[in-house]
A protein has these predicted regions:
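A Rossmann-like FAD-binding core segment of flavoenzymes
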Residues: 1, 7, 75-173
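Glycine-rich dinucleotide-binding loop and its adjacent helix/turn
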Residues: 11-76, 111, 165, 171-173
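Flexible loop residues that form catalytic
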Residues: 17-18, 62, 122, 148, ...
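Short glycine-/acidic-enriched loop or helix-start segments at secondary-structure transitions
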Residues: 23-25, 69-70, 123, 153-156, ...
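FAD-site-proximal beta/loop scaffold in flavoenzymes
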Residues: 29-53, 129-131, 137-218
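Rossmann-like dinucleotide-binding cores of NAD(P)H-dependent redox enzymes
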Residues: 56-57, 64-122, 202-208, 224-250
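Short helix/loop segments within enzyme catalytic domains
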Residues: 221
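Cytosolic Rossmann-like ligand/nucleotide-binding regulatory domains
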Residues: 253-256
Length: 256
């Protein structure tokens, strides 16, 4: 509602979401550009499609959201192109596994423009040009940005909590922050990777649910511990289901 007021507490749990990454590029504020993170974002995109009947879309980003968007827009009969800087979709997967996803997307008519850097957006002929470095622009009736998320930790920062990777909230294994009686859980907390033991930012529903239960148990006098996230995730695109857990080859090599 926008109302501001003060509230006292004995124990406080922060559970902020991750927010869509907004690139600082020319034209990012055009009215034919969208991001998708919340239910309201979904309604906004759906309303635009119902009102304007776009025939084509460019999706910037080839992660979970980008792939699921591509499938849904293809089901509506739209021409869909995914563009991103990495040369493979779904970075958590090894390249040889991602190649199967590439084939599945192409089989269902999704165009892939991989290894291209987006430099901005311009309106033209009733649509949007996606400007690429050293390449001809991609033109579409609408563009959806799905290039990742970052922690929404404005409140945590203002409160003076210790922050970590990408501004995430640092917690211990009891989900306690650097300030006594304040706990944090969910997409915006820094965790330990279960396999490597390194600090990580893993925004997934399963770990967030478990962290909430652990924080609640500790607030109620228990002694529950969060031992880390494995990064287990699964996606279904068209007729293929793909899953990943632990670390991929590149992460394993980096961790030694």
């Amino acid at each position: 509602t926008g109302e501001e007021f003060e509230e006292s507490y004995d124990k406080l749990i922060l559970s902020p979401v991750a927010k869509p990454t907004q690139p600082r590029l020319p034209g990012v504020g055009l009215d034919k550009l969208f991001t998708l993170r919340t239910v309201e974002d979904t309604f906004c995109i759906k309303d635009y499609i119902n009102a304007n009947h776009p025939k084509s879309a460019v999706l910037a980003g080839g992660g979970f959201i980008g792939l699921e968007l591509a499938e849904n827009l293809r089901e509506l009969g739209m021409d869909v192109t995914i563009v991103q800087r990495p040369k493979q979709l779904m970075n958590p997967f090894d390249a040889d596994m991602a190649s199967f996803i590439h084939n599945e997307m192409r089989k269902h008519g999704v165009k892939l423009a991989l290894g291209h850097t987006v430099e901005g957006f311009e309106e033209r002929d009733g649509g949007v040009d996606v400007l690429l470095k050293d390449e001809q622009p991609l033109h579409a009736d609408m563009v959806i940005l799905a290039i990742g998320v970052s922690p929404e930790t404005t409140l945590a920062k203002d409160a003076g909590l210790e922050l970590g990777i990408k501004g995430s909230i640092v917690v211990n294994d009891r989900m306690e922050t650097s300030i006594s009686d304040i706990y944090a859980v969910g997409d915006a907390v820094q965790v330990k990777h279960f396999v490597t033991g390194e600090d990580a930012l893993i925004s997934l529903e399963g770990p967030a649910n478990k962290q909430g239960r652990i924080a609640a148990d500790n607030i109620c006098g228990g002694d529950s511990r969060y031992t880390g996230s494995q990064g287990s995730s699964v996606i279904k695109v068209f007729d293929m289901t793909a899953a990943v857990t632990g670390v991929n080859e590149a992460q394993a090599a980096k961790a030694g």
